[in-house]
Amino acid sequence: MPRIELVIGDITAEHVDAIVNAANSSLLGGGGVDGAIHRAGGPSILAECRELRATTLPDGLPVGEAVATGAGRLHARWVVHTVGPVWPGPGAEADARRELLRGAYRTSLGLAARLGAASVALPAVSAGVYGWPADDAAAVALATAEETDAAPGT
């Protein structure tokens, strides 16, 4: 049975097969975990992201989708970049956005599985500058990881 472990720390120091990056749609780096992954991983990650933008993602990566690059100098094989939604505040729209957040986790975990990753480090997607409450983002991540693990073919 797969193991889920909560780690509070620097995701760039994790020794895993895949690190999920809470990216922005431009894929060109930014603040928070996105900037930390680009800095720690080195210029090859940005070069691959630029290539993706020039070839297959000219309009950027849509919310809830995921794409993989190499991991550069990180202790991983891949970086799985995903874009989460911006927190709209409590209310009906939050429920719809929560589905987008689930989608970001689901597509990231699915892509990591297709790549052959046996271990994946997930950040609290959307919890930084996108304003999502960290405890809710973590709960969505955990629930989605458990659902994904239980789904056939994952």
Mark where each language-model region is.
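Glycine-/small-residue-enriched capping loops at alpha/beta junctions
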Residues: 1-98, 102-114
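Phosphate/ribose-phosphate-bearing ligand recognition and processing surfaces
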Residues: 86-154
